[in-house]
A protein has these predicted regions:
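Charge-rich, low-complexity N-terminal segments
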Residues: 1-145
């Protein structure tokens, strides 16, 4: 089994609409992300590279210094005070650590699909997102591309 492990740190703001506690207010985090991709044997390009690590890291870094929202947060989406390129819209009902992890997971799967389409390789993709020192969410799925 071969593994690629990529880590990144990124800083964002967010808020949890409808949450009864302090997280309903705009606040920020320094997130730590870790992506592990495993395969029995990775395909290699013509210079024997398996995947472009920078493309995987950029999935996480794209969120750096941006406001994370969902489609329900019309305050940010419709505001003239926020630059559109400073806002990242996540799927789901809130910009939770769970939805950040799935945002990264989906982005990593897109990177694999673009770099090695149609190779029929089975990958295990694991994304770990640490929101705070104590709050971590992990998603792990097998895919064939």
């Amino acid at each position: 089994m071969e593994r690629i492990i990529v880590t990144a740190k990124f800083h964002t703001g967010h808020r949890q609409l409808g949450y009864p506690g302090k997280c309903k207010f705009v606040h920020g985090h320094t997130w730590h992300g870790k992506v592990t991709i495993a395969a029995e044997e990775f395909p290699r390009d013509d210079i024997d590279m398996s995947l472009e690590f920078g493309d995987i890291k950029n999935v996480m870094r794209f969120m750096d210094h941006k406001m994370l929202v969902t489609e329900q947060d019309t305050t940010f989406l419709n505001s003239e005070f926020f630059e559109p390129e400073g806002v990242v819209v996540l799927r789901g009902k809130g910009p939770s650590v769970e939805n950040v992890a799935y945002y990264v997971y989906n982005g990593v799967v897109d990177v694999i699909r673009k770099q090695y389409p149609g190779r029929n390789v089975r990958y295990k993709v694991e994304v770990t997102i640490q929101e705070t020192e104590n709050n971590i969410f992990q998603v792990e799925k097998d895919i064939t591309i």
